[in-house]
């Protein structure tokens, strides 16, 4: 990489850090190309990204961002993963760490809050934003569904009573 490419890479990474809500730092020492490719595919499916970056370039990109506290974690062969959905990137990273012992979580940051590896694991246990939205929608719709059922019940009962009277009148007439 020449200087212009490095500057462009740092600028791209800084732009990512300005827009994202969660960054996870991991050790990627000993991972095969197939492992990294599989991890990238899983990250993309979850709406996250995974990138191996030189620590010095990552340091430069982190300067002045809310993730500035990640700098001490950037030692040795590290990689960064990020996403708008904080739970998605944490879940993929934790699940991959369970299946691949060479992938080690170092920590991360959620906004300005720095997390160690156990903090990232705890975050991975939370429901995702989509799951929370579905639960909230279900909670909002449940009362309306119950009210509609209650309002329809008397009308249905009244219709059954009229039908019973009609059958009784037909039976008496016959």
Swiss-Prot record:
DNA damage keyword on record: no
GO molecular function, one term: structural constituent of ribosome
Disulfide cross-links: none
Pfam family membership, one: Ribosomal_L10
GO cellular component, one term: large ribosomal subunit
PROSITE patterns: RIBOSOMAL_L10
One of the GO BP terms on file: translation
Keyword Membrane: no
CDD domains documented for this protein: Ribosomal_L10
Assigned keywords, A-Z: Ribonucleoprotein, Ribosomal protein, RNA-binding, rRNA-binding
SUPFAM superfamilies the record matches: Ribosomal protein L10-like (SSF160369)
InterPro entries reported for this sequence: Ribosomal_uL10, Ribosomal_uL10-like_sf, Ribosomal_uL10_bac, Ribosomal_uL10_bac_type, Ribosomal_uL10_CS_bac
Family from the record: Belongs to the universal ribosomal protein uL10 family.
Subunit structure: Part of the ribosomal stalk of the 50S ribosomal subunit. The N-terminus interacts with L11 and the large rRNA to form the base of the stalk. The C-terminus forms an elongated spine to which L12 dimers bind in a sequential fashion forming a multimeric L10(L12)X complex.
Function: Forms part of the ribosomal stalk, playing a central role in the interaction of the ribosome with GTP-bound translation factors.
Entries under PANTHER family matching the protein: 39S RIBOSOMAL PROTEIN L10, MITOCHONDRIAL (PTHR11560)
NCBIfam families: PRK00099.1-1
Protein name: Large ribosomal subunit protein uL10
Organism: Acidiphilium cryptum (strain JF-5)
Gene name in the database record: rplJ
């Amino acid at each position: 990489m020449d200087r212009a490419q490095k500057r462009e890479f740092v600028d791209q990474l800084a732009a990512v850090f300005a827009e994202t809500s969660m960054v996870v730092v991991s050790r990627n020492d000993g991972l095969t190309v197939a492992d990294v490719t599989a991890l990238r595919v899983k990250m993309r499916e979850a709406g996250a990204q995974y990138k191996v970056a030189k620590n010095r370039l990552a340091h430069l990109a982190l300067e002045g961002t809310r993730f500035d506290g990640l700098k001490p974690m950037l030692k040795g062969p590290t990689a960064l993963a990020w996403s708008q959905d904080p739970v998605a990137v944490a879940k993929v990273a934790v699940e991959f760490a369970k299946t691949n012992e060479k992938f080690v979580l170092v920590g991360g940051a959620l906004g300005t809050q720095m997390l160690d590896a156990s903090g990232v694991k705890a975050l991975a246990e939370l429901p995702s934003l989509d799951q929370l939205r579905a639960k909230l929608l279900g909670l909002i719709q449940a009362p309306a569904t119950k009210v509609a059922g209650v309002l329809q019940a008397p009308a249905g009962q009244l219709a059954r009573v009229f039908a019973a009277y009609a059958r009784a009148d037909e039976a008496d007439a016959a």
